[in-house]
């Protein structure tokens, strides 16, 4: 550990490039969390949607990662990291601009396609940016460096939530009526409200698309560093080496479960708060609590990154995993404000999981890292599948959130967080297993040095 203290997290010659690439981490955070509240927003604007249908927003959004991650890895393998970033930004902007015709035609499926195109772009950006960050300094500080870059992702996430709250949720007219009053409106009035609200939903995405174009120009004018090595392995050899790497394979599984947990906790907090409001007669604003969760997430990321200076990353992952499981259990069992506090507290412990799993899984890799990073980005498909499963639990007794009481006292919306709990337990086990392995390897190394 004394060695890591003497090594700078980012090499001096790459500081500017590190800053530019870090902006991309915030940029996909904006898209992620601008979209998260859209599940409940589309449900209000299009009340004919079931909870499962509304959750297809997240399915379409995160399925793009699975679909495009491997092609992105093959693309940057053939060309360059910079080329991958440029393609990613072009797709990002294109998907954002597609919101305009989607709103014009009032097509839910068109919106889903637009979101899918955005995440095809994000798949390029994440597949490119994450491994590139690892190369911008000494490998001893690679995981710490990635955590530092990822610490700016929740800043983007908070920005996305603020945009969603003040540019969309507060402006849509569908939310101004009670269910009874809304159903009593004439077909002409309903059509007018829907046209207005879908137009409002499209505005922040179109603005985001314009901002992405500005970043695209900056990236085109920025000289990016070449990676520390050229691709010497064939694609087949890379796959063979990855499939033989048990640590990597388990890392992909852990990443899929982590992303599923994160998206479920940040998506269904809106339904969780709605149920509290209806049950206890409160008027809580879900977005504010989601922003609070983001702030806790950001704080946890910075604290976790600092802890890694002197503590094994796998050990931190294990302990943070335990904390997440404990809070998820509280979100299930407790009702009202205590349950809500437990739910947002999960974000503290999720904060370091994505970059830490990423860094551990790719540790000591060489040529196969580009393909390996694609597998970890494809694992984000967990964010596409899990919310649909959670939405199906909410539909057990009808369109409400407490139609069914589990064990006689747990509303179905609370019980649905059993899925994030299971996901976080899987991540905890990965942290435990890799920590045990690292301790064993360290002992073996010390014995060899002694001999």
Model-inferred region functions:
Residues 16-44, 129-130, 265-273, 386:
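Extracytoplasmic
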Residues 35-39, 160-172, 241-291:
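Extracytoplasmic gate region of multi-pass secondary transporters
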Residues 55-76, 291-303:
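Central cavity-lining transmembrane alpha-helices of secondary-active solute carriers
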Residues 122, 141-173, 374-387:
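Glycine-rich segments within core transmembrane alpha-helices of 12-TM secondary carriers
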Residues 2, 6, 11, 20, ...:
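Multi-pass alpha-helical transporter architecture, strongest
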Residues 108-125, 338-353:
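Hydrophobic core of transmembrane alpha-helices in multi-pass small-molecule transporters
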Residues 124-138, 351-366:
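Intracellular juxtamembrane helix-capping segments at the cytosolic ends
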Residues 90-105, 322-336:
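C-terminal ends and interior cores of transmembrane alpha-helices
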């Amino acid at each position: 550990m004394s060695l890591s203290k003497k090594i700078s997290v980012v090499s001096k010659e790459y500081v500017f490039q590190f800053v530019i690439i870090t902006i991309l981490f915030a940029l996909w955070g904006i898209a992620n969390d601008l979209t998260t509240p859209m599940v409940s927003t589309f449900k209000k604007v299009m009340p004919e949607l079931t909870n499962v249908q509304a959750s297809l927003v997240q399915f379409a959004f995160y399925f793009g990662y699975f679909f495009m991650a491997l092609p992105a890895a093959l693309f940057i393998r053939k060309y360059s990291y910079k080329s991958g970033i440029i393609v990613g930004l072009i797709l990002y902007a294109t998907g954002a601009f597609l919101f305009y015709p989607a709103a014009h035609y009032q097509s839910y499926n068109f919106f889903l396609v637009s979101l899918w195109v955005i995440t095809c772009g994000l798949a390029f950006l994440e597949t490119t940016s994450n491994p590139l960050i690892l190369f911008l300094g000494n490998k001893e500080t690679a995981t710490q460096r990635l955590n530092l870059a990822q610490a700016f992702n929740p800043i983007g996430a908070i920005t996305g939530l603020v945009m969603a709250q003040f540019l969309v949720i507060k402006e849509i007219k569908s939310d101004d009526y009670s269910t009874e009053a809304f159903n009593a409106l004439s077909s002409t009035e309903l059509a007018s409200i829907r046209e207005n609200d879908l137009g409002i939903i499209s505005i922040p995405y179109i603005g985001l698309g314009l901002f992405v174009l500005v970043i695209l120009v900056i990236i085109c004018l920025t000289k990016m560093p070449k990676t520390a090595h050229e691709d010497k392995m064939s694609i087949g050899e890379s796959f063979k080496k990855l499939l033989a790497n048990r640590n990597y394979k388990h890392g992909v599984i852990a990443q899929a479960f982590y992303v599923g947990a994160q998206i479920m906790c940040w998506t269904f907090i809106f339904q969780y708060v709605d149920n509290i409001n209806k049950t206890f007669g409160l008027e809580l604003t879900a977005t504010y609590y989601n922003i609070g969760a983001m702030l806790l997430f950001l704080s946890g990321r910075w604290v976790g990154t600092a802890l890694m200076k002197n503590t094994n990353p796998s050990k931190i992952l294990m302990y943070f995993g335990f904390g997440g499981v404990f809070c998820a259990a509280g979100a299930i069992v407790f009702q009202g404000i205590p349950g809500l506090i437990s739910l947002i507290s999960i974000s503290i412990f999720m904060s370091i999981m994505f970059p830490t799993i990423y860094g551990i899984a790719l540790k000591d890799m060489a040529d196969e890292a580009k393909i390996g990073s694609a597998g970890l980005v494809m694992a984000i498909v967990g964010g596409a599948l899990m919310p649909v499963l959670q939405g199906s639990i909410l539909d057990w007794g009808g369109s409400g959130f407490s139609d069914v009481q589990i064990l006689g006292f747990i509303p179905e919306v609370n019980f649905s967080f059993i899925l994030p709990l299971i996901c976080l337990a899987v991540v905890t086990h990965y942290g435990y297993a890799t920590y045990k392995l690292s301790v064993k390897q360290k002992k073996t190394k010390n014995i060899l040095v002694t001999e």
